[in-house]
């Protein structure tokens, strides 16, 4: 969709929203029927035009997909055996495109920022993901078609229902706003919260068969085992980051025991999606390029932030998303950091560098926005997070995640492994600290506590 079409669609969307608000106001004020019907008429006229644009998107997408398949840019894996959903191969042209993208990525980040590039194994012991939280929290909620056995993501069904419900020209502005809230938060709703709207989504979208209830969690990691006995459980990694965290001490020492430093990694990752869809946008195996930037937690300024501070980006802060009818707006990156929308110069620097990389890659800046995660959708490890989203025929799609993970991962692996994954700071002058120390009188404790004496001594030693 080119810029004029995009502008046209937004104008029509706003017209529909404004007029639906007017309809709701007239209905609430018990206006005369002819006046209310006249107000309803504009949304009904506008919606077919909007649908025509959406139809053009679908036709264009179908033509592109067929061309990419015919020219072997990308095609379904093991197609002679009918393939498996979510698995794709790159042909010669597709592989060349991938290599060119990764080459530019290395030039823009690894080379320019003097990062360490490493390659860690994809097979990972269970203990690693127990520590990181992935075993418990890397899940989606699913339901089952009780007739044909097909599985569906519960949040996708709820989102689809809400989007279709919003197309009803008779819906009130208040109900539309409530549906918008559900759509914005749907991927983060608990099974109980999804159950609150489940009576509207109790049948499968195509077969209309009944669906299981309530939704149950499904872990997205592929489980495996090591060795002949199968007693040591492992997983195929869903992200490359955990290898970098577990090896932190080695990289820190290699960097002269100095902060900050960054570790980059490109590799295959695996996610057992419940219902892969949207072609290459949701697959079960794909290439991920990640950077872990380690910085002093109390010194998150960045020496090169001034290089990107004046960039004006389409940004969608959390506060704006929580207001009805708002869109992303152009903000100066320096201003976004100064106002606290972005929590530090370091995070702001990488937002700016991602923007410059994507523009250099050929992404239209009018179709590129940075969306702030809402508080309820933040990952369990994040203190702040922004997504670079690109507008395509499927709408706004997340392509890059930029998160402040704080010390979550290093602290978790330190506690579980018993190895201190920490950095040390040399102070210009020593800091004197007064500490209350309890020195137990053992000859008094023995008679008083007898067999519990050891437990009492250990309790007194706790800071």
Swiss-Prot record:
GO biological process, one term: diadenosine tetraphosphate biosynthetic process
Chief subcellular location: cytoplasm
Similarity remark: Belongs to the class-II aminoacyl-tRNA synthetase family.
Biased composition (Basic and acidic residues): 44-54
Compartment(s) where it occurs, according to its Swiss-Prot or TrEMBL record: Cytoplasm
Name this protein carries in UniProt: Putative glycine--tRNA ligase, cytoplasmic
Top-level class of the enzyme under EC nomenclature: ligase
Function: Catalyzes the attachment of glycine to tRNA(Gly). Is also able produce diadenosine tetraphosphate (Ap4A), a universal pleiotropic signaling molecule needed for cell regulation pathways, by direct condensation of 2 ATPs.
Keywords: Aminoacyl-tRNA synthetase, ATP-binding, Cytoplasm, Ligase, Nucleotide-binding, Protein biosynthesis
Gene3D superfamilies xrefs: 3.30.40.230, Bira Bifunctional Protein, Domain 2
NCBIfam families, sorted: glyS_dimeric (TIGR00389)
Subunit relationships: Homodimer.
Residues involved in substrate binding: 153, 239, 286-290, 376
SUPFAM superfamilies in UniProt: Class II aaRS and biotin synthetases
A GO molecular-function descriptor: protein dimerization activity
Keyword match Nucleotide-binding: yes
Catalysed reactions, semicolon-separated: tRNA(Gly) + glycine + ATP = glycyl-tRNA(Gly) + AMP + diphosphate
GO annotations of cellular component type: cytoplasm
Known EC number: 6.1.1.14
Annotated residues for binding of ATP: 271-273, 281-286, 398-399
Pfam families, alphabetized: tRNA-synt_2b
Positions of region (Disordered): 25-54
